[in-house]
Amino acid sequence: MLEPQYKRVLLKLSGEALAGEKGFGLDPNVVTNIATQVKDIVNMGVEVAIVVGGGNYWRGRTGEGMDRTTADYMGMLATVINALALQDSLENLDVLTRVQSAIEMRQIAEPYIRRRAVRHLEKNRVVIFAAGTGNPYFSTDTTAALRAAEIEADVILLAKNVDGVYSADPSIDKTATKFNELTYIDVLKMGLKVMDSTAISLCMDNSIPIKVFGLEDPENIKKVIYGDKIGTYIYS
């Protein structure tokens, strides 16, 4: 019987990943598939926290002519939509789930309180962190790194639309090569588009490894938990 390689993980989901092939909004089949995989790893005894992006509805940096702070807050609200959708899908599968928002909206989510989040995890509840850090100018990648450090996660699982980290965008450059392993310094020096530099630096300072993988295989989250050699592993 295979044993999970991690006890507590932080799963970072991009908004685009939740949109599936539609590219915008939510694909119910994709959300259900992710929820099913999360249920499977919770049943293994793994504690799961999730950070969701909002790029399937809004990206702060695309708000041309708009105040950056306002655009970023709109992006934070988009992450709340995704968090609630994922919570609903998980609870339909009988997975106890809590959404914690960095911007208070008590009718629909708990406020983010680190100690409460850790207690939820210890009770095998999934915790979804919404609204980024609650501050403009910080991406959801940085949120993932920050929350992973705060809850002392063993690893960040970075689920993307591509199956790892490449030397260039594989959808544009057909000669792009995939990396199996990288150090944080490699990522920063080569300017690879894994996470933004703030997030990478935060992971490096706190020795939090990152596993980058694609969602094209509906079993990939489980495979990563079991230690399968897929995607790209980033470490100190």
UniProtKB/Swiss-Prot annotation:
One of its GO terms (molecular function) is UMP kinase activity. It is found in: Cytoplasm. Pathway: Pyrimidine metabolism; CTP biosynthesis via de novo pathway; UDP from UMP (UMPK route): step 1/1. Transmembrane segments: none annotated. ATP binds at residues 12-15, 55, 59, 161, 166, 169. UMP binds at residues 54, 72, 133-140. Allosterically activated by GTP. Inhibited by UTP. Its EC number is 2.7.4.22. Residues 20-25 are annotated as: Involved in allosteric activation by GTP. It is an enzyme of class 2 (transferase). The keyword Transmembrane helix does not apply. The keyword Kinase applies. Signal peptide: none annotated. It comes from the Bacteria. SUPFAM superfamilies: Carbamate kinase-like (SSF53633). One of its GO terms (biological process) is UDP biosynthetic process. GO terms for cellular component: cytoplasm. Keywords: Allosteric enzyme, ATP-binding, Cytoplasm, Kinase, Nucleotide-binding, Pyrimidine biosynthesis, Transferase. Catalyzes the reversible phosphorylation of UMP to UDP. Belongs to the UMP kinase family. This is Uridylate kinase. It comes from Alkaliphilus oremlandii (strain OhILAs) (Clostridium oremlandii (strain OhILAs)). The gene is pyrH.
